Amino acid sequence: MATKSPVNPKVPLVQEPDRDEGGAVVLERRTQKTKPPHMYQVVMLNDDYTPMEFVVVVIQEFFGKDLEAATRIMLKIHLDGKGVCGVYSKDVAATKVDQVLDAANKAGHPLKCISEPVGF
């Protein structure tokens, strides 16, 4: 008994290629839709030992805030127990957290800083 080889149906191209006068094939490019990256907020947590002035300086230095904005964030941290210093992509937020923790550690302060996803 002879077996038939399966017939492979032709898979159509996205769009029929156009040929220019030189015989080259030109395919149309599909645009890709990419989602924006997930964002993370960098949050400083209050403690009873880190001086307020140090927190203000750290916010100015690592988050680019002016004195007034840094003071507002520091007061939010002090009064509410935590405050958002900025919103960044995951890698940038992790770097900011590391910078804050390193500066606090070098200065001998127990300041804590975390990053958490926004909108989850």
From Swiss-Prot:
Transmembrane segments: none
Pfam families given in the database record: ClpS
Cystine residue pairs: none
UniProt region (Disordered), positions on chain: 1-20
Highest taxon of the lineage: Bacteria
InterPro entries: ClpS (IPR022935), ClpS_core (IPR003769), Ribosomal_bL12_C/ClpS-like (IPR014719)
GO biological process: protein catabolic process; proteolysis
Function, in words: Involved in the modulation of the specificity of the ClpAP-mediated ATP-dependent protein degradation.
Quaternary structure and interacting proteins, as annotated: Binds to the N-terminal domain of the chaperone ClpA.
Family membership noted in the UniProt record: Belongs to the ClpS family.
Name the UniProt record assigns to this protein: ATP-dependent Clp protease adapter protein ClpS
Classification of source organism: Bacteria, Pseudomonadati, Pseudomonadota, Betaproteobacteria, Burkholderiales
Gene field: clpS
